[in-house]
Amino acid sequence: KPYAKLERLMAFSDTGKCLDLTDKVKDGMLCWKAPKGSWRLIAAFCGKTLQKVKRAAPGGEGYVMNHFSARAVKNYLGRFERAFDGKFKDTAGGATAYPHNFFNDSYEVYGADWSEGLFDEFLARRGYKLEEHLPEFLAAGERSDKTRCIISDYRETLGELLQENFTRQWTEWAHRHGAKTRNQAHGSPGNLIDLYATVDIPECEGFGLSDFG
């Protein structure tokens, strides 16, 4: 399977024109005759981080999940359901009671700043197309007010996806099974207060640490 999937291919002219060329890419080849002028092409790909779970508990080894994807989180929680219901070979012999709490030990997924379908989510939530502003979004150096607004909207969208698709779905799932959620939200790409408010027991670690030597 390919390491990354093309999400958008955008062309930007020196006169301010923007074209979406995504549907002109077939089998990895672009079929497009550029109009007169100077054009800059920006391709946006979505791929896997290939990160493994850190300090995994027995049975929890493997790749990290996509916290922004409702489907990925649902699949992850479904594995726990099958385990507690005794539907795995190594758990055959009857169901096991769910614990009183499920604990999320902080957000430690580095470089995970995108998700499949994020362009569509951005449009639905922010009301404009992020792909049409990729030059500003990716610009280095001093940021203009417009660029700051675009980046703020992008971060808000990621935060909403994390809260809705991971934190809220996880908490609602736990409640259906008579359990509560404990969460360390620090490190998450979202509004920490909102994330803490979405769980039953907010926790933190190392907040405001001082070196007492």
Place the predicted regions along the sequence by residue.
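Core alpha/beta catalytic barrel or barrel-like domain that forms the active/cofactor pocket
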Residues: 133-151, 157, 182-191, 199-203
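Short, well-ordered alpha-helical packing segments
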Residues: 77, 81, 119, 159, ...
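Substrate-binding cleft/loops of secretory-pathway carbohydrate-active enzymes
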Residues: 107-116, 180-212
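Small-side-chain structural scaffolding
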Residues: 11, 174-176, 199
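Aromatic-lined carbohydrate-recognition surfaces of secreted/lumenal glycan-active proteins
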Residues: 98, 103-106, 154-191
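Secondary-structure transition/capping motifs at alpha-helix termini
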Residues: 87-96, 171-180, 195, 209-211
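Mature extracytoplasmic enzyme cores
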Residues: 1-152, 160
